[in-house]
């Protein structure tokens, strides 16, 4: 049996499922498609965040211009100032700066978040490249087939080969904006991860500062508690001697012993808190707990004298959690538009060019030339209500994102209000504790001077020193709290707002970066990417 070249080419085209089709667009249809494409932006919500209340001040009461002066520092609340990027440097401690730098460079959690962000950006780049540009594929076919004989019709058994090599090009027009909206939704979700990564960086820095200050505060408390225990034990020994001489009652002895034991019982708990803080700090900066850094000298840490208070309307642009919620809202809005666009027709053009035949001589000759060009139009008609349900689901997701944004803003306002109130109250508590410590120290010094003159017994000096050390313990605790709460306020202020015109890939500018010059898959594979 013989076949001419036209039959050979036809068989190859059928094998590769390419059909020659002519498709002509009427001018009226083109105009309608353009009009619908221009209307694609109205397929869903705009994604603009809802209007939020703009309070005159954050808390139930307006914050003062500054706190009371405690230990010589009255912190000023600078209303309208921008957040400080590297706020931890304001503590004036090189050791603290080094800890934060080490943590930002070595934290496994932060590194994992960064890798996840980069993976999301690459996925966006791939989706934009595959959806906005034509796909080009090389197709090669080499087959050997056998057809059975049909003696009744005089057809003998036939064996033949099919060989073909084609370049296939396809492109789907984004007439109704489905592709654009899907890309916008994915870009917004990538921006969510970018803002979450930014929030993770700031949270890590704040946690390192809080852990370092907490460990230093506990260290100072342990030292002071140790001095109190030594004084209490000495007092108990003195009462024991006086009891043996009959100058002290048994009740006095038991009371002194109970006081010493009570102080001793508090020390293991403080040490456990201190060790836990050191272990936590080591892990935060990427070390094992046995490599925990030495404690800071609490006396060398300077309290920042000024703290920024971003106005409520600007807080929406400085807090990464609010920006992430806004990006989530934009993604949900684009999802509604994409779900709507799926209900409209899609148009795809395809073309192929190559060589084919039943033998290599035919494949390499002009008779083996193959080509196909075609277009397809697909209009959903009945999908069991799936497309309508998907759009309703997208609308509900959008409403949920809208409500989540509102809650995120309200929570941010509450966070700032709590931090401002805490700093004000911390200063008041520290001022009172410092006054108490100074007074107790004065009593101790006077009692000691009177003892040297023989006016009071030694145990009176020891008792006055105990009172001073107890007051000093409270002063240390409140100073540590004030330092930590200051860090929390810096953290609550967020980052300085970024000009969108100069926004780089470090924050929410992933769409343009991902869309830039998609590389060919073959080239990337050749480079091992």
Question: What residues fall within each predicted segment?
Answer:
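Short flexible linkers and secondary-structure junctions
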Residues: 42-207, 347-351, 370, 381-391
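Sec/SRP-type N-terminal targeting helices
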Residues: 111-112, 129, 173-201, 251, ...
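Outer-membrane beta-barrel proteins
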Residues: 147-149, 250, 358-362
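Membrane-embedded beta-strand positions in outer-membrane beta-barrel channels/transporters
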Residues: 100, 164-168, 212, 312, ...
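Periplasmic alpha-helical coiled-coil/stalk elements that build and connect Gram-negative outer-membrane
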Residues: 179, 188, 195-311, 422, ...
């Amino acid at each position: 049996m013989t076949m001419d070249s036209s039959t050979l080419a036809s068989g190859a085209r059928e094998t590769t499922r390419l059909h020659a089709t002519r498709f002509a667009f009427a001018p009226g249809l083109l105009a309608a498609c353009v009009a619908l494409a221009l209307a694609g932006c109205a397929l869903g919500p705009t994604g603009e965040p809802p209007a939020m209340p703009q309070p005159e001040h954050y808390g139930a009461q307006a914050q003062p211009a500054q706190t009371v002066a405690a230990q010589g520092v009255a912190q000023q609340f600078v209303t309208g100032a921008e957040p400080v990027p590297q706020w931890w440097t304001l503590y004036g401690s090189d050791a603290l700066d080094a800890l934060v730098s080490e943590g930002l460079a070595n934290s496994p959690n932060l590194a994992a978040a960064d890798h996840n962000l980069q993976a999301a950006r690459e996925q966006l780049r791939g989706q934009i490249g595959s959806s906005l540009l034509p796909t080009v594929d090389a197709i090669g076919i080499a087959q050997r087939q056998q057809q059975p004989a049909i003696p009744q019709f005089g057809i003998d058994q036939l064996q033949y080969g099919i060989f073909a090599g084609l370049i296939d090009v396809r492109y789907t027009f984004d007439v109704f904006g489905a592709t654009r909206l899907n890309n916008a939704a994915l870009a917004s979700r990538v921006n969510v991860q970018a803002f979450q990564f930014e929030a993770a960086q700031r949270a890590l820095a704040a946690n390192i500062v809080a852990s370092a200050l907490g460990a230093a505060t506990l260290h100072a408390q342990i030292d002071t508690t140790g001095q109190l225990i030594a004084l209490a034990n000495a007092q108990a020994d003195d009462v024991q001697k006086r009891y043996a001489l009959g100058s002290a009652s048994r009740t006095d002895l038991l009371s002194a012993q109970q006081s010493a034991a009570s102080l001793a019982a508090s020390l293991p708990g403080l040490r456990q808190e201190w060790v836990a803080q050191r272990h936590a700090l080591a892990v935060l900066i990427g070390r094992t707990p046995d490599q925990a850094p030495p404690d800071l000298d609490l006396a060398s840490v300077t309290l920042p004298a000024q703290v920024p208070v971003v106005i409520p309307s600007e807080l929406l642009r400085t807090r990464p959690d609010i920006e992430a919620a806004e990006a989530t809202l934009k993604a949900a809005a684009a999802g509604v538009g994409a779900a709507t666009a799926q209900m409209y027709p899609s148009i795809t053009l395809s073309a192929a060019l190559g060589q084919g035949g039943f033998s290599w001589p035919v494949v390499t000759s002009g008779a083996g030339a193959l080509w196909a060009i075609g277009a397809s139009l697909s209009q959903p008609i009945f999908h069991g209500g799936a497309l309508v349900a998907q759009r309703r689901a997208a609308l509900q997701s959008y409403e949920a994102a809208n409500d989540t944004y509102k809650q995120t803003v309200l929570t941010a306002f509450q966070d700032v209000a709590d931090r401002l109130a805490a700093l004000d109250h911390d200063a008041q508590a520290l001022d009172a504790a410092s006054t108490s410590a100074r007074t107790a120290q004065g009593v101790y010094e006077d009692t000691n001077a009177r003892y040297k003159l023989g006016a009071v017994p030694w145990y009176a000096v020891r008792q006055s020193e105990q009172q001073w050390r107890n007051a000093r313990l409270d002063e240390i605790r409140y100073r540590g709290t004030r330092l930590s709460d200051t860090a929390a306020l810096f953290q609550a202020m967020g980052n300085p707002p970024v000009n969108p015109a100069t926004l780089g890939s470090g924050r929410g500018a992933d769409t343009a970066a991902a869309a830039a010059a998609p590389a060919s898959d073959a080239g990337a594979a050749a480079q091992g990417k």
